Structures are given as C-alpha cells and as structure tokens.
Amino acid sequence: MKKLLIASTSTIHGTGYLEYLLPTLTVFFADVKKLLFIPYARPSGISYDAYTKIAQKAFAKIHIEVVGIHEFDNPKEAVLNAEAIFTGGGNTFELVYQLYKNDVLATLKQVLENGTKYLGTSAGSNICGVSMKNTNDMPIVYPPSFTTLGLLPFNINAHYLDPLKNSKHMGETRETRIKEFHVFNETAVLGLREGSWLEVLGDSITLKGTETGRLFEKDKIAKELELGLLIIK
C-alpha cells in the first residue's frame, strides 16, 4: 500500500527547512530510524553532500538519521533496502535525468507501490505524477524521458501561484501555461500551493495543510479543491 507525503515546498516563508511539516513527519515516520535522501535535484547547484547535510539537520530534530543515496556504490540496492525515502526539491530536469542515469526510477516506483514510506517536496513531488511536464523549472539537462513515477493519476504543479491583481507582469501565468499543456496532453494537473501537501494512503488521496488546491482538466473550467479527501481520475 502506498504511503506518501507529497508537499508543494520544503520551506514556507518565515520558517526553516521542513519546519512547517515536522509535526506531520513526526507521526508519519514514527517507526523510521534511518531515511534515504535523494539529493539529485541540487537546488541552486549545491553539492549532494551539502544538500544531504541540510536534510540531516532537519530530521535530527525528530531523531531520524539521514543518509544520501550518492553515498552508496549501488543506488538501486539502497532504494530496495531503505526504511523510508525523501526526495528533495531543486531542478526537476536534473532530478529525473539522474534517476534515469542511475537506473533507479523503476526501482523507486516498485518500492513505493509496495509500501516504503516516501516524502517528496517540490521536484520530489513533481516526479510522483504521470510525468514531469508541469514543472516550473528550466531544462538545464535533457532526461531521456519526461515519464516519472505515476504514483498519482495526475500531474503536480508545485509552488502553484495565482495571478496577482494589478500586476504589470506580462509573462504567462501558471494557469495559462497549464492551459497550453492541455492543448497537447490529456493528464489532469493539480496546482499545489505552498503550505499544502497530499497524503496518499493506498488509493486514498487527501489534501492537507493550509491552502486549497486548484485542479485543471482538459476542456474544463479550473476548480478549487477544498482540504480533505480528493477524487481525481
């Protein structure tokens, strides 16, 4: 049975790394002593070691040891043997590129479908959808495929932002870009605002946190999703 926390962001304004999620993580990972961290997304281009130290500092507050996947000679074996797994945010293109390069995407999907607990934030949440096509990130590398874990029947647009009233910005809004996506694609997209996350237990998907979600479906008017159980096909 899938046991996933899929968060829009690792950090909300005015707080520390994962601070807003710690009460939830304390309960979710109550039986976990050691967690495998996947730092492949490298926010701001930081090293795997530096990124892993950030995760270690946060999880030390709830007495969980963190080890980076890059520390293992065999990353597939590390995924297979992990008590729990956390994929952090950064650049989704780089993350997916490395998951394919190290041949761990299929193994990651396998263990998560079989019940290994998982936390994803930002890019680590994007990969839980059918594809990574609704990332906000720049294509700094070219992964062999945009297909990702498919643990959700829809895609995630993390850090979803609503249009700002009276803004003079002339670029596309998130909603406009998602409409462009639906000209060529059928997959539904959930705009996940900062401060909210999905809790997935088996086939049950619950929107939690402080913000509503925004659901985009092809040829339909976008709609707000209240906190609580979601039914998205």
Task: Give the positions of each predicted feature.
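A general structural motif
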Residues: M1, A30-L35, A82, G115
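Class I SAM-dependent methyltransferase SAM-binding "motif I" and its flanking Rossmann-like core
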Residues: V96-Q98, L105-S167
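Flexible gly/pro-rich beta->alpha loop and the following alpha-helix that scaffold active-site loops
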Residues: I64-K117
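C-terminal and late-domain segments of enzyme folds
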Residues: K2-D31, R42-K53, P139-K233
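A short beta-strand-loop structural module common to alpha/beta enzyme folds
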Residues: V32-Y40, H70
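Structural motif
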Residues: L5-I6, A84-G88, L119-G120, I156
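Short helix-loop-beta junction
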Residues: K53-E65
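Short, active-site-adjacent cap segments at secondary-structure transitions
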Residues: P43, F93, S125-C128, W197-E199
